[in-house]
Amino acid sequence: MNKEDIQEYFKLRMVEALHKDTLDSFRVRTNNVISILHELSKILEGWLEGNIKRFETVDFCIKEAKELIDKDECIVFSFLNKQLLKEELDSYIANSRQKKNEVDTAGTKQLLFLIDTIYSSNNSIYLEKCIEKIHELLSFEADIPDAEFVPTIDNINYYISSLCCEFLRLGYSKVYLYTYFKVFLENKKNIPFETAFSKMKENFLSNTEKDFTVIFKLEFQDKVAAQRATNKIKNIVEELSLDIQKSITRQPSYKISNAFIRYYVVNKKALDTGIVTRLAYEDLSNDFDFNLEDIANLKMPSTALVINDSFIRNEKVYYFDNKEDIVVTESQPLGETIYNIKQNTLSKDIQDRLYSALRHLRIGDQQTEIEQRFINYWIALEFIFASPRSSESTFERIKKYLPEILECCYVKRNILYINKWLRGKKVLKDQTSWDTLSDKDKEVIIGQVDILTKYRLLKLKARMCHKDKTKEYIKNHRNNLEYHITRIYRLRNELIHEAAIKQDMVNVTSNLRFYLVFTLNQLIVFLIERKDSTRELDISHFLGKFNILSKYLKKECTINNFMSMVSIDKFII
């Protein structure tokens, strides 16, 4: 592997990390070392103030922070070093666990001061240091031996993920970043990599917010309410100015003028059109919050017209990651399947949960406002996992059983994704699975594919070659699930109890929907598999299946077991 190969990996990986259709395991991560420090600071504040009730929330965030701190070489420590910081974190966890769910006030304030100091020292410089680190890793002149291929790419991969996180943290939208790096990859002007990389660095380090005009089209059901809203809210107009109308050539619907149509027009500054649309939508929401009587029957818009000096374009308010489970090509008929379950399965408890969850999934999918989506997806998940005993915490059951369901299916899901990926590249025949190929056939395919695919295949091969490696692979996935489920629950509490709306709600909502849909599909598979059961089934049988299977797969950790003992069928997308 030479320098040009590594540079090609950078281009391919940036596009993959930012693409909405990429498997969640390969998309940009939730945090880098800077964003996790910021998140930890907010969690410590909430812990001090009593808004966070469980030390476990703090504990999980510290564990995640330690992992990122340990890997990162760009972060600057003002008056301590990495080892001392990790020791301080360990000491705080040990002292706090002794107090159970009581706050160590002095220790928390000291740690909060330390975290805030490190965050402040790195907040404005991390992007440049991360780009410089990547450039250093991409400029290695000597050929890299095959034995060092995966470790070398692992290191580059960490900083690519950190860079993507940093772009998002600083206020870029994922859709803008994807478009930018797609052009970078395609390189239709044949610009040398060093020149293109330097230009990219200059663009992002010197980038400033631009001026945009954002227009939402409002369709009222009541013309009296439309006029009242126009009179009360300064940004609502009956028709767009002549200058704007003249500039609109491809969106004629924005030129309509009648008693029921109004336009919400706001001027905003932002780094790109995706972000400015979301910021303008927040303004629209805030104005409507104080004028409820005028917008009772108004459906919130999901798109906007965005204008600046050089273009006019339509933008969605929110871009969600792909709903479709991309490891399976065809979905099964949901309605017919549900009918057969009703007719053939003794499972009133599970069916009631399934129907309620499906109802809230549908309601969530139909919502424009992100808070309503999130809450309905969470309600649906609670319907599935709730205990009939009020003394049992639904969240504790979600945190215990949801990772078991997902970890049992993780290996098979990822292999099916690899299969589909390789078939798309015309190097794997239909009905053939990567895991069943001989080592010789695998080597042939590895020699035919691009460097990103080669890396994926070698990583998968290494993880599947020995039981201990596979166990570690599953354990890491479970840890990440526990971190993220705890994060989702914290955001749920903030949304419900504090009416707080977070910038990362879109990504978290996409993740929550994936967990919900995957669980629902597994629940349907469970009912189909047990259609001839003479025993009345309830949710404990479904959860118990995965609890036992999880224990078994930890002991008998073979590819054959992972592939044969779970079904990944798609009824809901």
Predicted features and spans:
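Charged, non-catalytic interaction/linker regions at domain boundaries
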Residues: 94-372, 379, 506-571
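N-terminal accessory alpha/beta regions
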Residues: 31-133
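Generic recognition of cysteine residues
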Residues: 61, 74, 130, 164-165, ...
